Structures are given as structure tokens and as C-alpha cells.
Amino acid sequence: MSDNNQCVIVGIAGASASGKSLIASTIYNELREKVGDHQIGVITEDCYYNDQSQLSMEERVKTNYDHPSALDHDLLCEHLEKLVRGEAVEVPEYSYTEHTRTSNTTPMTPKKVIILEGILLLTDPRLRDLMHATVFMDTPLDICLLRRVKRDVEERGRTMESVLKQYQQTVRPMFMQFIEPSKQYADIIVPRGGKNRIAIDVLKAHIAKLLKA
């Protein structure tokens, strides 16, 4: 864990569609008034999927997006370190339909609180060392699958067949190999998804305590 108290970094990990984004956005919205709109931000690990613009679409769709090698954690670490030092960064934008980064970026200025959310955040010791608190969303995989099918079909233009095939071939095996074991690094394990009110209140209280430290 980082000793720098000027920027509190909270990492939220867990399976795809386990409620990470929901709990991150809830905490963000409920803490904005306390810390200030411009002093809290959310970074999604998905933004740091590797740039695959040099590959054909046929090659891009074969990428195992649930393996740590699919992510540019070097750049994510670099950006977090810059934010902690008080420097602004340009967060990449990733296209789920094109399976690569776009030319757009989102500027982010230094914050008092940064909430990270992503499936593989706790697998990287460099990222863990930058975090002041770590969270694992312990949602049953069958629930995650139902949510993922709905999300990917409705929001990302996927077919149900492709979502189920990906789940069987990479999502579930990679969860067992990488994501589930990373639960051991969580300070807080959250059951029942992103609407767990007690867990949200505990996290908010812990962040407030860290800000006062």
C-alpha cells in the first residue's frame, strides 16, 4: 500500500458483471459532495486494454481479454503514479466494437480520491502497492453470466452465441486462474453485488478515514 496520503486510491476487482461499476459509481456520486466534484474520479481498467490497431479485425476478436497480457498495466501504473505526483494524464478510450483503442482520450487531473475498477486489478503487485484499499466483488458466477449476456448484447452489439462462447472458452477459465485467486489481496470482500448498502457505507467510511490520516 502506498504511503502517500495526498491521493487515496481504491481498487475494486471481481468477475465481469459482478457489480464493480455499480459500486464504484455509487461511491463516486455519494462522495462528490463531501470531497468536491473535481476531487474524486473513476478509472476503468478496460480503458487500458492494449492498442490493437496494427491487427486485423479477425486477429483482434481472438484476443483473450480476460488474461492479464491483454491489458497495458504499465501505462495504468504510470498514469496513477503521475496523478499521485500531482500531474494530469490522458486516459485512453477503448472501443468494444472495434476491439482496440480509439484516437480519443479523456483528460484526468489529480484527485483526492481515485476509484479503480476492473477484473484483473488485484493480480498486479505494482497496482496493489499503489492502492490504499482493495475490494473484491464476490458475486456468484451464474449471476455474473446473466448480467454479462444482457449487457454485451444490449450495449456492446454482441450476439448471445458469441458471449456464451467467450464465457466458456476464456471468461470462466481465466476467472478461475487469475481473478478468483486475487481475492486473497482484498481488504474487503463484498457479497451480493453492487447494491450491498452495508458494504458501500463501510467503504465510504474507510475512505473518509484515509482522507483524514
Swiss-Prot record:
Query: Under the cellular component aspect of Gene Ontology, which terms does the record hold?
Result: cytoplasm
Location(s), subcellular: Cytoplasm
Where's it mainly located? cytoplasm
Which residue positions does the secretion signal occupy?
none
- Molecular function per GO: ATP binding; cytidine kinase activity; uridine kinase activity
Lineage top rank: taxon: Bacteria
Residues the entry annotates as binding ATP? G14, A15, S16, A17, S18, G19, K20, S21
Reaction equations catalysed? uridine + ATP = UMP + ADP + H(+); cytidine + ATP = CMP + ADP + H(+)
Q: Which InterPro entries match?
A: P-loop_NTPase, PRK/URK, Uridine_kinase, Uridine_kinase-like
Transmembrane annotation, as ranges: none
Biological process terms from the Gene Ontology for this record are: CTP salvage; UMP salvage
Per UniProt, the enzyme's principal EC class comes to transferase
Gene3D superfamilies the record matches = P-loop containing nucleotide triphosphate hydrolases (3.40.50.300)
**A Pfam family hit:** PRK
* Keyword annotations of the record: ATP-binding, Cytoplasm, Kinase, Nucleotide-binding, Transferase
Which pathway?
Pyrimidine metabolism; CTP biosynthesis via salvage pathway; CTP from cytidine: step 1/3; Pyrimidine metabolism; UMP biosynthesis via salvage pathway; UMP from uridine: step 1/1
- NCBIfam families membership: PRK05480.1, udk
UniProt lists the family membership as follows: Belongs to the uridine kinase family.
Would you tell me the protein name for this molecule? Uridine kinase
Give the source species: Vibrio campbellii (strain ATCC BAA-1116)
Question: Species lineage, top-down?
Answer: Bacteria, Pseudomonadati, Pseudomonadota, Gammaproteobacteria, Vibrionales
